[in-house]
Each structure stands twice: as structure tokens, then as C-alpha cells.
């Protein structure tokens, strides 16, 4: 999609803002995306970030100047009626905290946690309502690091909740042209992976992954523009669950400085 971006770098502190146009649907609904984030680093081994991403839409809706201010937030804009449309159902926001920690030259940990819907009222919790959320984590270890070989192993986990990335107005879902924004399998799912990366530091890169994936019937990939049914807690993944084991491998080889050969294999058992 087309977007404009503003970035600021103050050394240990960095900030970034984007505003873009996602698409116009067949019934003249214009859809936009805007995001702002701030990141702190110790310039050695640690990066911590906070971000907010918003999708807003409306029939023949123009670019909303309420979101032009890079330091404004979705809740502040919406609750103070600064949008170019009435009400509080014309936009959908998610908030994310992330971290990346290089413990030493061989060990690295990264993680992300995303909120889509906050549930703060005890009554709502008692009625079975839950946060809309997603999270991921990765641990990588480099047992071989020499002048001729770089070998890294890793384990990763990713979970996206059942109603996450959906909205009461389906045109504010995190999708573009029927494809999810984010994890390619949408939502209502979980994935584990073990992987291996190899680089001979000259002309060969190889990657191998093995993992398991589970997706439920409420994934945003099946009904991209439908609103969520509710935020009530339930079995996860929901409904009929599709489970699969998968293996992927990729290879890049520079045979000559001007000739590169690429190859890959993707396999899964497509079980359910």
C-alpha cells in the first residue's frame, strides 16, 4: 500500500510515524492505516519499543487530519471527537510492546505482546470476556561463529487470539485486499518452530525450519471483512481446528558475482 513516513533519531531514542491508504472497496469504503511508535536502545544489546497501529474506514471517507499529528493517540483523538466522522466505531487500534535483547554474542531473545481489546471491568471478566491479544517470542543461539562459518539455531512461538485483529465494523479489520496484515495465517492460531540458519560467509546461505501450526475456524483469513462475534473466552483455537506439521528449506548460492541461484522446499501434512 502507499504511505508516507516520518522518522526521528535522537540517538538512544527513535520515533517513527506512518500514514497510508489501504484500499477502496467495491461499495466505496475507503480504508486507511496509521501507526506511531517509539523505541529506546542502549546502543549495545537492548531495544525496547512501544507502538500503536490504527485502521480507519468509511464511505467515501477522506484522509482524517485527526490522525496527522504523530504524537496524538487513537483514544485521545476518538474520545475528544476529533475524527472526521461521528461516533467511536469508525476506527480500530492495537497496541504493542516489543523487546530485543542480545545477551551475549551467541544468545539472543526477542518478544512481542499485542493488545487489541482491553477488558478492565471486573464485571466483564466475570461474564467471560477476555482481552484480544497476540504474542510472539524467539530464542536464538549461535554455536558456531568463525571466520568461515556462521551457524544459528532458534526456537520461536507465535499466538494470535481468536477475535484479535477484528473489529465491530469489519472494514476496520487488519486486512488488505482479502489478505491479513501481520501473520500470513491471520488469527485464531498458534505456531511453534525450530530452525537452523547457515552462512559460509562467502557465497552460500541455507535455512531449515520444522514446526507445528494450529488454526481455528474463526481465523480472519476465512472471512476477512466480517466483524467479530464477541470477546467471550472460549476454546482456543476455536471450532474445527486444522493442525499441520511443516518443513521449509531455502538455499541461496552465488555461483558467480553476477549469478545467483535460489531454491526452496515447502511441505506440510495438511492434517486436521
Question: Which residues are covered by each model-predicted region?
Answer:
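Exposed, low-structure sequence patches enriched in small/polar residues
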Residues: 46-50, 54, 59-272
Amino acid at each position: 500500500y502507499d504511505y508516507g513516513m516520518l522518522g526521528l533519531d535522537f540517538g538512544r531514542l527513535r520515533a517513527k510515524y506512518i500514514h497510508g491508504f489501504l484500499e477502496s472497496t467495491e461499495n466505496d469504503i475507503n480504508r486507511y492505516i496509521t501507526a506511531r511508535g517509539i523505541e529506546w536502545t542502549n546502543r549495545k544489546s537492548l531495544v525496547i519499543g512501544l507502538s500503536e497501529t490504527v485502521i480507519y474506514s468509511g464511505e467515501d471517507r477522506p484522509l482524517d487530519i485527526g490522525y496527522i499529528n504523530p504524537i496524538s493517540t487513537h483514544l485521545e483523538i476518538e474520545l475528544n471527537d476529533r475524527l472526521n466522522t461521528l461516533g467511536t466505531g469508525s476506527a480500530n487500534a492495537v497496541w504493542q510492546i516489543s523487546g530485543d535483547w542480545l545477551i551475549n554474542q551467541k544468545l539472543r531473545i526477542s518478544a512481542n505482546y499485542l493488545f487489541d481489546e482491553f477488558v478492565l471491568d471486573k464485571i466483564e471478566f466475570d461474564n467471560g470476556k477476555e482481552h484480544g491479544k497476540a504474542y510472539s517470542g524467539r530464542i536464538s543461539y549461535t554455536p558456531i561463529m568463525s571466520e568461515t562459518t556462521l551457524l544459528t539455531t532458534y526456537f520461536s512461538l507465535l499466538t494470535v487470539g481468536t477475535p484479535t485483529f477484528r473489529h465491530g465494523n469489519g472494514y476496520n479489520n487488519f486486512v488488505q485486499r482479502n489478505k491479513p496484515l501481520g501473520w500470513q495465517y491471520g488469527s485464531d492460531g498458534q505456531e511453534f518452530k525450530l530452525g537452523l540458519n547457515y552462512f559460509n560467509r562467502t557465497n552460500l546461505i541455507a535455512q531449515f525450519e520444522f514446526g507445528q501450526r494450529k488454526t481455528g475456524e474463526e481465523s480472519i483469513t476465512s472471512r476477512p471483512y466480517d466483524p467479530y462475534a464477541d470477546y467471550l473466552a472460549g476454546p482456543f483455537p476455536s471450532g474445527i481446528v486444522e493442525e499441520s506439521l511443516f518443513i521449509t528449506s531455502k538455499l541461496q548460492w552465488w555461483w558467480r558475482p553476477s549469478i545467483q541461484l535460489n531454491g526452496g522446499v515447502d511441505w506440510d501434512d495438511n492434517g486436521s
